[in-house]
């Protein structure tokens, strides 16, 4: 039993040390930088009044919490983050739209969004379907008419059979 507990204890110790070292590197526990707090960077050659304000700001930098005890959040950083999220989502949407258009052009079924585009492939297909259905209907009606004439005892003459063959060929 002791042989099994030593590797488990060692694994637990390694995991704990990794997590603890990562938590020390976490920015909330360290002092925030001047760039994150004010979006101001001290430039070289700053005058005496700026040095005094920089000393006053250094007290703020030591405490990452505001006076009321809540963490300090930079509004401009949140705005930049929101802009980045919007830009990435918008780019993804544009990519999906362009992929859809490309796929439609490959298939040959472009969706016409304006009157100027000519939906010829779709129209040709619908015309062919209509013509096929209409031809089938005419043949069925000709067969029905011929069978009715035979069943009713009317014999067709030479002229009627020629009309029947013409109707079947149409």
Swiss-Prot record:
Modified residues (Phosphoserine): 76
Residues recorded with modification Asparagine amide: 152
Glycoprotein among keywords: yes
Record's signal peptide: 1-21
Tagged with keyword Cell cycle: no
Subcellular location: Secreted
Transmembrane intervals: none
List of glycosylated residues: 133
Coiled coil: none
Gene Ontology CC terms: extracellular region
Top-level taxon of the source organism: Eukaryota
Propeptide: 22-79, 156-170
Residue numbers of Isoleucine amide PTMs: 107
UniProtKB keywords: Amidation, Cleavage on pair of basic residues, Glycoprotein, Hormone, Phosphoprotein, Secreted, Signal
GO MF entries: hormone activity; neuropeptide hormone activity; type 1 vasoactive intestinal polypeptide receptor binding
A GO biological-process term: adenylate cyclase-activating G protein-coupled receptor signaling pathway
Annotated function: PHM-27 and PHV-42 are two bioactive forms from proteolysis of the same precursor protein, that cause vasodilation. PHM-27 is a potent agonist of the calcitonin receptor CALCR, with similar efficacy as calcitonin.
Homology family: Belongs to the glucagon family.
Protein name, entry field: VIP peptides
């Amino acid at each position: 039993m002791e042989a099994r507990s030593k590797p488990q204890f060692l694994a637990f110790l390694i995991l704990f040390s990794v997590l603890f070292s990562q938590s020390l590197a976490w920015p909330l526990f360290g002092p925030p930088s001047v760039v994150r707090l004010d979006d101001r960077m001290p430039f070289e050659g700053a005058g005496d009044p700026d040095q005094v304000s920089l000393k006053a700001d250094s007290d703020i930098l030591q405490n990452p919490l505001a006076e009321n005890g809540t963490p300090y959040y930079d509004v401009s950083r949140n705005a930049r983050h929101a802009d980045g999220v919007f830009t990435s989502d918008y780019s993804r949407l544009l990519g999906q739209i362009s992929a859809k258009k490309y796929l439609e052009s490959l298939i040959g079924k472009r969706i016409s969004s304006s009157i100027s585009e000519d939906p010829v492939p779709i129209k040709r297909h619908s015309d062919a379907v209509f013509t096929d259905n209409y031809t089938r209907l005419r043949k069925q009606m000709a067969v029905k008419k011929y069978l009715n004439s035979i069943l009713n005892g009317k014999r067709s003459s030479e002229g009627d059979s020629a009309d029947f063959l013409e109707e079947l060929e149409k």
